[in-house]
């Protein structure tokens, strides 16, 4: 059987597609997967790195653009539609899965005209315009969060959760808090004394802003470094900055005398999650799926300009269950960020309990459910 997975742009769209591809290929060695994306998206480097074939098409957004921008976007989409039709004729897939992002629209429209079974996966609490449009004719609509069900036709909608890549699933057998939490709990002398006053244990912090980094988080961490340096907590920090901020952030850590690994991009997120006691990050749906599966306590700083503020709503779904911490970007400051990090570093039991509550909300079989549904029409 052959499957096309279309979309991307960001890791939040792409990584669930990679998870589905891994599951699909595991069912039958003869199965084939082809990814379709754009040259500007993360898929241009991440899909080949993951070992999957990729075809690039023209696609662009039109929402929020002026008249000329909308015309250009529409022209690119039409060209992408023609390219998609040619790909369908050449590859002859049995099904097409759209995972969101610009490339999914022309490919699924082409699949519709070629009468190829089509499916979409929505990662967020509030779906984007592309998936809202495609849902009108998709054979099946897979959703990550119950909150998004109101946007789609109920009889074709299935709550699956967000598919997890193999590198994350392989860590499930060792899921727990990072080594810093375990060491702090061992060193605590009584139930009331804050661990931050106990010398020795290191609290491991993972900071990232999605696959492309987040400038606001990067700059807030830079501003918070003097406050973190003065505190009596040993911090081990891994900070993924994105390409544009890497040198500036790395220089700030060196200047402040704070130990850190500063990276533009992290390919092996599973290993970094395993080392972390606390994760400071955006609230994209894929990030949430990964950290809940690995029982990680998170301080979410939702991207305030996400379409329909969906990142805040993603985080609030966990916050209502005391399964995370959240700081809105409009409230973000060096003082507040440092205070929250130090508060949590000093309370390992709270961090552990939050991670346990996060795990209780994880859905670990999303990729299996989606592949089962994709295979069903051909059985």
Swiss-Prot record:
Gene3D superfamilies: Glycogen Phosphorylase B
GO biological process, one term: regulation of cell shape
Class of the enzyme per the UniProt entry, highest EC level: transferase
GO CC annotations, alphabetized: plasma membrane
Recorded topology in the membrane: Peripheral membrane protein
Keywords, alphabetical: Cell cycle, Cell division, Cell inner membrane, Cell membrane, Cell shape, Cell wall biogenesis/degradation, Glycosyltransferase, Membrane, Peptidoglycan synthesis, Transferase
Stored CDD domains: GT28_MurG
Biological pathway: Cell wall biogenesis; peptidoglycan biosynthesis
N-terminal signal peptide: none
Molecular function GO terms recorded: UDP-N-acetyl-D-glucosamine:N-acetylmuramoyl-L-alanyl-D-glutamyl-meso-2,6-diaminopimelyl-D-alanyl-D-alanine-diphosphoundecaprenol 4-beta-N-acetylglucosaminlytransferase activity; undecaprenyldiphospho-muramoylpentapeptide beta-N-acetylglucosaminyltransferase activity
Subcellular location: Cell inner membrane
Catalytic activity: di-trans,octa-cis-undecaprenyl diphospho-N-acetyl-alpha-D-muramoyl-L-alanyl-D-glutamyl-meso-2,6-diaminopimeloyl-D-alanyl-D-alanine + UDP-N-acetyl-alpha-D-glucosamine = di-trans,octa-cis-undecaprenyl diphospho-[N-acetyl-alpha-D-glucosaminyl-(1->4)]-N-acetyl-alpha-D-muramoyl-L-alanyl-D-glutamyl-meso-2,6-diaminopimeloyl-D-alanyl-D-alanine + UDP + H(+)
E.C. code: 2.4.1.227
Region entry Disordered, spans: 174-195
Pfam family, one: Glyco_tran_28_C
Residues that coordinate or bind UDP-N-acetyl-alpha-D-glucosamine: 10-12, 124, 165, 211, 266, 311
InterPro entries, per database record: GlcNAc_MurG, Glyco_trans_28_C, GlycoTrans_28_N
UniProt superkingdom: Bacteria
Family classification: Belongs to the glycosyltransferase 28 family. MurG subfamily.
HAMAP family: MurG
Role played: Cell wall formation. Catalyzes the transfer of a GlcNAc subunit on undecaprenyl-pyrophosphoryl-MurNAc-pentapeptide (lipid intermediate I) to form undecaprenyl-pyrophosphoryl-MurNAc-(pentapeptide)GlcNAc (lipid intermediate II).
Name of protein: UDP-N-acetylglucosamine--N-acetylmuramyl-(pentapeptide) pyrophosphoryl-undecaprenol N-acetylglucosamine transferase
UniProt organism field: Pelobacter propionicus (strain DSM 2379 / NBRC 103807 / OttBd1)
